[in-house]
Amino acid sequence: LKSFGSADAEQGTPMKADSIFRIASMTKAITSVAVMMLQEEGKLLVKDPVSKYIPEFKDQTVMVPRDPKDPQAGYDTVPASREVTIRDLLSHSSGITYRFWGNAAAAVYEEGGVPDGLSPNGGQTCTAMRKLAKLPLLHQPGSVYEYGLNTDVLGCLVEVVSGKTLDRFFKERIFSPLGMKDTQFFVAP
């Protein structure tokens, strides 16, 4: 096993074969695997509305920008045409977005206390996603692909359905059985 390059270019630290990295958005794939494991066990169905497990996602609204070319012009809301499903979250077509895209939802998310999706939230995923559920969607569920906090909602769903924290579920059900001893939810100092 060989390593190449630098683990830290600024410090001049060389890469080692056993260097540890944050996996960042690769957790999306792991969270999706967790959801599919729960489906295999009959604990949920991807066609289920999210509100079946997280009631705050019931009766959502959708933003209708007053001027689609000007996000600062404000918006009105209309009822969602249907409920957001687990499948919508898996395919990033729920209408949920990220704050950092700078779209019409950015200011609403920030004012509503929704995380930016880049910073660690200290294990408060469900608290944050319940806040998100009370805010309007950017698009009608299932209508538009919009990369966003969908997997964060799925992480909350895994916690609710399994009764375990997401890091514990990952460790007990995925990482340990696969012998992934160097893969952790949080990197120890």
Q: What residue spans do the PLM features occupy?
A:
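A generic alpha-helix surface/boundary motif
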Residues: 32-33, 152, 168-169
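Mature N-terminal segment immediately following signal peptide/propeptide cleavage
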Residues: 1
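Short glycine/serine- and small hydrophobic-enriched flexible loop segments
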Residues: 36-41, 152-160
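Active-site-proximal loop and beta-strand segments within enzyme catalytic domains
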Residues: 4-146
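Active-site-flanking alpha-helical
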Residues: 35, 170, 179
